[in-house]
Amino acid sequence: MASQTQGIQQLLAAEKRAAEKINEARKRKLQRTKQAKQEAQAEVEKYKQQREQEFKGFEQQYLGTKEDIESKIRRDTEDQINGMKQSVASNKQAVIVRLLQLVCDIKPELHHNLTLQKKLHGQFAA
């Protein structure tokens, strides 16, 4: 009987040690998983920074800096405004003369609807 109790005790102790080893293995696995996740995150962040740097280099090479774009837009806008001012200056007198002609030179005429009505009325009267 004592040997059975001792055998049971040994089995319980072995089961306890096995459970501890399983728990330790789970903890190590969890720790390795966390570490792998952190390493992967660091690698992703490094790759992201690298691609961002490449994009900035590409952008600067082909598009120029933001200030360059602003100054180019400003120059283009000023050129367009100056062109419009020159167009106004060169056509101003002709527009004034044309407006005065349209306002002052009145040619009385019958409205085209009235003319059409007279033509239609004349067809039915005949």
Swiss-Prot record:
Keyword DNA damage tagged: no
Single biological process term from Gene Ontology: synaptic vesicle lumen acidification
Record has Transport as a keyword: yes
Renumbered residue ranges of the record's region Disordered: 23-45
Oligomer and partners: V-ATPase is a heteromultimeric enzyme made up of two complexes: the ATP-hydrolytic V1 complex and the proton translocation V0 complex. The V1 complex consists of three catalytic AB heterodimers that form a heterohexamer, three peripheral stalks each consisting of EG heterodimers, one central rotor including subunits D and F, and the regulatory subunits C and H. The proton translocation complex V0 consists of the proton transport subunit a, a ring of proteolipid subunits c9c'', rotary subunit d, subunits e and f, and the accessory subunits vah-19/Ac45 and vah-20/PRR.
Family: Belongs to the V-ATPase G subunit family.
Annotated function: Subunit of the V1 complex of vacuolar(H+)-ATPase (V-ATPase), a multisubunit enzyme composed of a peripheral complex (V1) that hydrolyzes ATP and a membrane integral complex (V0) that translocates protons. V-ATPase is responsible for acidifying and maintaining the pH of intracellular compartments and in some cell types, is targeted to the plasma membrane, where it is responsible for acidifying the extracellular environment. In neurons, required for necrotic cell death by promoting intracellular acidification.
Designated name of the protein: Probable V-type proton ATPase subunit G
Organism: Caenorhabditis briggsae
